[in-house]
């Protein structure tokens, strides 16, 4: 669906460029925003657990997510649809291979970062990431930056991660892999403000206008699929699997609780993924996430307005019809 939405807005981009801060660069490209809105058309039900991230959608945050399949991105897009304007103010870090997919050009225009994996590219990619953040994050008024610290899909990295854990006397993980430090460290170094925080935007002890710019929170997201069977994009498009309820767990950490030193930050990241392992182990045994300490486990079913979904889908068909008419006109003019 991504190219159709980009195609719909393409004829108007010269006009939209006059209002870059509001439409194109500041709030995300119309094509990308609308393509995100089409995701619920192919996803199943999503149930949310843990902290309520709506409380921090006006603040800057780095979002850490476990990675099992390509469908994780679609799940996140759906979860964000009822979280206000933050869905239009996000930056994504994704594998460079996605640059060559149908939504690659949309992500490029949106200002997302494509990162190459492997030791041969690691140092160079971190330098490029730092420059990319300096160029695009502030200028396009981004709020959240999303990354997958494991550096790849679970099925591809599990064996290597377990061997590394055994060699370094680290916990044996089955449902996640040990995260990599590089990108997370660059993001924290580049985007941290000088003021420590501890209260979400709108809280009693802090007013938004008094806050300095900079990351305020780390949002730790754990995605779980029933029977540990993740959904990829092909499955959603072809629809050859029974409807699935995807579960998403949130934890919010004040940025002041995140250490800056590399060794301490590595330990902190490892602890987050060890906690993810415990969360997923509990989920696969019981079908539910355990409650946070001192709280009762409460799930929230994520729902969207059906009329809104119909409108978004209609826009997709409209874009196709519009380009059919445009191409047909030029064909008759030329031939």
Positions of predicted regions on the chain:
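A short pocket-lining beta-strand/turn micro-motif at the edge of beta-sheets
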Residues: 214-217, 244-248
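Juxtamembrane amphipathic/hinge helix adjacent to a transmembrane helix
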Residues: 263-303
